[in-house]
Amino acid sequence: MSQSSDFILNSTLSSVVERSTPDIAGFCSGYELRRHHHEHLANEGSLRCRTDWEQFIGPIERWGSCNPWEGHFGAVVLPFCKPERLAVICYIFEYAFLYDNVVESAAKSTLNLNTDNIALDETEYRTVRSILGTKQIQSKMLLELLSIDAPRAEVVINSWKEMISTTAKKDKTRAFNNLEEYVDYRIIDTGAPFVDMLMRFGMGIMLTQEEQKRIEPIVKPCYAALGLANDYFSFDIEWEEFQAESDKTTMTNAVWLFMQWENLNAEQAKRRVQEVTKQYEQQYLRNIADFAAGEGKENIKLQTYLKAQGYQVPGNVAWSLRCPRYHPWLCKEAASLLHQDTIQELEAGRKPQALEEYRSRSHSESDLSDASPTFWSGSCRSSARSSVSSAFGPPDKDISITPAILGDEHLLGPAEYISSLPSKGVREAFIDGLNVWLVLPDHRVNQLKSIAQTLHNASLMLDDIEDHSPLRRGRPSTHMIFGTEQTINSANFLLIDVMEKVRQLDDPRCMDIYLEEMRNLFIGQSFDLYWTRNGECPSEEQYLDMIRQKTGGLFRLLTRMMVQIAPVQQKGLETQLASLSDVLGEFFQVRDDYKNLTEEYTGQKGFCEDLDECKFSYPLIHALTSQPKNVQLRGILQQSRSAGGLDVPLKETVLSHLRQAGSIEYTEAKMGELMEKITDSVVSLEGETGSPNWVVRLLIHRLKV
């Protein structure tokens, strides 16, 4: 794979690594190896991740993606990554390498459900810290990706979600009958498609759905070669662990499988894996050549992408030759070399934040001895296997509703339907964010998420009936399928079911909180319904007060309950957190009003549906109060009440009046004001607690319009 002038890969970002043989340890014949000129940024990303890991999760127990000899994993696998994107991608690589055993083992710890409500025992604390820390780091990663390039970041996030949903269903102990079956499994297990999406993000490449379908069969041999090479180089350390653990009966490694399939010893099986890996490598080269000579002859974009993808193959092999992850006896020497390289970077004038933190730590808290591992010298002994997919666990499972004695299919049918519809997951993310400060055990967090989801679903079912709304999240509203009466019955049951869930929190004060906030919520809803039915336009302050009662009620309910049952009492934060909940509720509703007028949202819920429902939204209230003599606008709204809705031309006329009144800009300004309050509140809470909250920051970023 020599460089061709027909491609637009930026060769100034990396250099060819010269070698004396046409292959690399028997692999990669015909492949060119390159190393990124900005490798210090790759090391910076890894170092920053390790710093965050120690802060949010705990001591580092394993080696990551750095290699002082052949180069950082990201520097040799992604030699054409834009320099400004290399650090965050290598942060993600480092997280994936660190995650496998540390958080996995912590997640298997059993929570002591008999502990009191004042403090966590050690096992529970370590588990909660791992779960919270993982969410913090993942949120920080996503936030940085989104802030750099939101459209391509969304592609990465969607790939992440797909990987989670796919790998969660995979049986790690399954038996494989042949190589093809195993390769299909291993491609997903290693997270190769996800790494591919990270490469695209790094280069700023975006493929259409049609282009994605065209390249999938072309790149499959590349994915296969990457996974099998990983098996080859990681086998020795995995084999040692396998023999030491008597309870294991199988290995997810191609070398092991060839030992079983063909009755080979380990060395013979490794040679077989090398043979088939080389076959996949050469197949990928042929695929690229055939594409460039045939259907893709004029498609420089896809040729560039396929060429860049191919550089992962030699980069992965070269990195594997002496990476301490696969060769634990090299840990000490590698740590020393990386320490020297880091100091040289500082002396050369490159002083990013993480390197400064490294210098501070190396002068105080840690050294390079075995007794006190630095960022670089974590143990290499545990699970050397590289599996990006395992680093991103499946989403939390919701607590199911207890079946009724006489059968619950009619009672829960509407509830199950509304629960199956797409959801933004805002309230669940809000709980995760608050828990960074409150540190509730995971079973309590899941209980609160179940309360939030159940209560929200009940609210949606009743709201759609009261608003005469035919759509919910782009699908028919619940009452349009099950009928009004059955939907009301199901929603009412959910309110009772929530009371049972609150009771299970084992704190009587939580039931008081539930009743208080439910009363507030129903009062707020009563005003909304009254204004709509009687055509009485509220003032802006009245409307915002209604939002605080209604929309903010659920946020406030969750906040107060979390503070109440927090293992470390945080009563001093209750006022600040309640204020954050109120402002977030205001922003959420004003944002919803605004998005109801945009094409993106109306595709889900119906074009300007608020006008059909005769609801007074924030922009409409501004227009009516700022232009009290606008008889045309008032006439159209009266027509909506009489006719039960408006046709599209009349809705467009209303939008025109809103624009003329400056109501759209006024709403945007209000959202900006509320977002500033939210941000200030978060910064204040971070200062008060001493804990940065990347989960909340990511939530805020995703809510911005």
Swiss-Prot record:
Binding site for isopentenyl diphosphate: 424, 427, 456, 473
Key word Repeat present: yes
Locus of motif DDXXD 1: 100-104
EC number: 4.2.3.218, 4.2.3.219, 2.5.1.29, 2.5.1.81
Binding positions for Mg(2+) 2 per the UniProt entry: 100
Residues engaged in binding Mg(2+) 3: 463, 467
Family in the record: In the N-terminal section; belongs to the terpene synthase family. In the C-terminal section; belongs to the FPP/GGPP synthase family.
Protein name: Variediene synthase
Record organism: Emericella variicolor
